[in-house]
């Protein structure tokens, strides 16, 4: 029996103010775990897969049920421990300790590879938590859309004078992360062709309004692109096809996109990337029969796609790796110059990280969209002098469809996050929100990840692979009073390539919550400033001094 497959279940988080657990501090992780598996949120909820290839919310359905049971029973001075999606212990701690501690997919470095992970996975001893799948703070494609938007806008500033009108972006992948790309592109003023091999993913992005059109052939997609250019309006097109075939074909035809990237699940060559020339049915059968052959065929196909991306790069077209480790896979297959084009963080995002700015997110546990709209207004009130942020919030309200529990993301940094958290808590206390909110972030943040091919690529001091930083981030968030804290391995880029930490904190309107919020939402982004200041970035050093951080040898 497959303990991970249950087509009979439909999971949706409870809404409203009635509790099924003993407090909001345990009701919150319960609802957010369930929300991760809402069919409007998750990629394959019947298999517990949230996004990112095989990124799961729980190890199997028995573990899922036991986690819910433990959360319902958990006391105010107890902490639940979760090991790779399985509840393993409840211990007496204290009221300000995290209610849940999560460790997902962590392996001793010498064994930190997909082969060993899959051996353990088959034995039922481990699961892949991705970043926010196994840490119960995934909010659908909105979770990455602003970061993608910021990246495209910055690329437009650097390469096209700040104007992407009439230009188009080529990419691959419309999964949980890649699905944000089409909306981010049109928000930034550009059109997009996003190549996706799975029809259901295209349909999901159309249904949730992240995508405008579907094309079944490259010629059809190009015709749609030309029509949009004539009309003067950006359009996003989901092209049913294989990026490994479409990218080289565009090179052969001499067709020039204006920006090229990729968000296929290349980090997982067995489950995440369709080899060139294969059907979906053959791929599924081969994954069961010979996963090693699948991985080899996928990596060879990735090499072909990266060669095409390098061809675009040599034409002078901006090309960026969007953090799925496709360059490393291609390099493994003999593409020696795979890293000639940059990753998106060193190219466009690092100055934000130096100031602790990253993907701050919150969700309304009530299920009421009005709670999000009220918090949107509060963000504008508290940060009145940031027109770019206000523009983002206006666009988000107009364009972004909520998936599951209503949620919002906006990139804010040190000195802003704790003020917002305290304000949201006060809104709950005054009854301006109909239930508490949870506040969290992606593991892709300034101080919470070590990933040499993504977030920490090309660090100034060469410390790309030093993973002490996310460990310190997790420890500090525990000490500061986060409601749940997670420590993962392999998210985004695959086994052996990253370690990262997450935190979530509940604003329930109490004085105790206010104290925790002030500590956590100051300390968490401050670790990002610390990490970048330690690496020698002047922006981070200045930010640390401006905010009075005590960094021995740097600010002292």
Swiss-Prot record:
Q: Which residues bind NAD(+)?
A: 52-53, 130, 176-178, 196, 201, 242-243, 263-267, 273-274, 322, 492
Q: Which Gene3D superfamilies match?
A: Urocanase like domains (3.40.50.10730), Urocanase superfamily (3.40.1770.10)
**Pfam families this protein is in?**
Urocanase (PF01175), Urocanase_C (PF17392), Urocanase_N (PF17391)
Q: Which reaction does it catalyse?
A: 4-imidazolone-5-propanoate = trans-urocanate + H2O
| Pathway(s) served | Amino-acid degradation; L-histidine degradation into L-glutamate; N-formimidoyl-L-glutamate from L-histidine: step 2/3
Gene Ontology MF term list: urocanate hydratase activity
Required co-factors: NAD(+)
Q: Which region is the signal sequence?
A: none
Keywords, comma-separated and alphabetical = Cytoplasm, Histidine metabolism, Lyase, NAD
Q: Which sites are catalytic?
A: 410
List its EC numbers: 4.2.1.49
Specify whether Lyase is a keyword of the entry.
yes
PANTHER family per the UniProt record, alphabetical: UROCANATE HYDRATASE
Family recorded in the similarity comment: Belongs to the urocanase family.
What job does the chain carry out? Answer: Catalyzes the conversion of urocanate to 4-imidazolone-5-propionate.
Name it. Urocanate hydratase
Organism name: Acidiphilium cryptum (strain JF-5)
């Amino acid at each position: 029996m497959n303990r991970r497959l249950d087509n009979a279940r439909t999971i949706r988080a409870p809404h409203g103010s009635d509790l099924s657990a003993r407090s909001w501090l345990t009701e919150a992780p319960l609802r957010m775990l369930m929300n991760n598996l809402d069919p409007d949120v998750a990629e394959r909820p019947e298999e517990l897969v949230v996004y990112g290839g095989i990124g799961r919310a729980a190890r199997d359905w028995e573990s899922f049920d036991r986690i819910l049971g433990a959360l319902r029973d958990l006391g105010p001075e107890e902490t639940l421990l979760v090991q790779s999606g399985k509840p393993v212990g409840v211990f007496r701690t204290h009221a300000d300790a995290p209610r849940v501690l999560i460790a997902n997919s962590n392996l001793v470095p010498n064994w930190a590879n997909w082969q060993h992970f899959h051996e353990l996975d088959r034995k039922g001893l481990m699961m892949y938590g991705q970043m926010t799948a196994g840490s119960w703070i995934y909010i659908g494609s909105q979770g990455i859309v602003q970061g993608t938007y910021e990246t495209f806008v910055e690329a437009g500033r650097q390469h096209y004078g700040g104007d992407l009108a009439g230009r188009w972006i080529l990419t691959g992948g419309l999964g949980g992360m890649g699905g944000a790309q089409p909306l981010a592109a049109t928000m930034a003023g550009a059109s997009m062709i996003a190549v996706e091999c799975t029809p259901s993913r295209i349909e999901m992005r159309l249904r949730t309004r992240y995508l405008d059109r579907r094309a079944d052939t490259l010629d059809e997609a190009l015709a749609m692109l030309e029509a949009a250019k004539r009309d003067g309006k950006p359009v996003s097109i989901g092209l049913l096809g294989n990026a490994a075939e479409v990218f080289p074909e565009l090179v052969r035809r001499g067709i020039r996109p204006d920006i090229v990237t990729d968000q296929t699940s290349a980090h997982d060559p067995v489950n995440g990337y369709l080899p060139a020339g294969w059907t979906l049915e053959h791929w599924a059968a081969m994954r069961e029969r010979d996963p090693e052959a699948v991985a080899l065929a996928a990596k060879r196909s990735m090499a072909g796609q990266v060669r095409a991306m390098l061809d675009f790069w040599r034409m002078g077209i901006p090309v960026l790796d969007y953090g799925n480790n496709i360059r490393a896979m291609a390099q493994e297959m003999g593409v020696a110059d795979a890293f000639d084009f940059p990753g998106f963080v060193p190219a466009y995002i690092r100055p934000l990280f130096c100031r602790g700015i990253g993907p701050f997110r919150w969700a309304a546990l009530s299920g009421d969209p009005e709670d999000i709209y009220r918090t949107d207004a509060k963000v504008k009130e508290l940060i009145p002098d940031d027109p770019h942020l206000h523009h983002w919030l206006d666009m988000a309200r107009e364009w972004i469809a909520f998936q599951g529990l209503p949620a919002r993301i906006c990139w804010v940094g040190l000195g802003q996050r704790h003020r917002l958290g305290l304000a949201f808590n006060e809104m709950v206390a005054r009854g301006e929100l109909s239930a508490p909110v949870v506040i969290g972030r992606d593991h892709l943040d300034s101080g919470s990840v070590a990933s040499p091919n993504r977030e920490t690529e090309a660090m100034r001091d060469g410390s790309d692979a030093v993973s002490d930083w996310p460990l310190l981030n997790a420890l500090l968030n525990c000490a500061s009073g986060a409601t749940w804290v997670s420590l993962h391995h392999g998210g985004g880029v695959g086994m052996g390539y990253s370690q990262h930490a997450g935190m979530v904190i509940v604003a329930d309107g109490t004085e105790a919550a206010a104290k925790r919020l002030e500590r956590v939402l100051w300390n968490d982004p401050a670790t990002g400033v610390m990490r970048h200041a330690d690496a020698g970035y002047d922006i981070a050093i200045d930010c640390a001094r401006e905010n009075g951080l005590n960094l021995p040898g740097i600010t002292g």
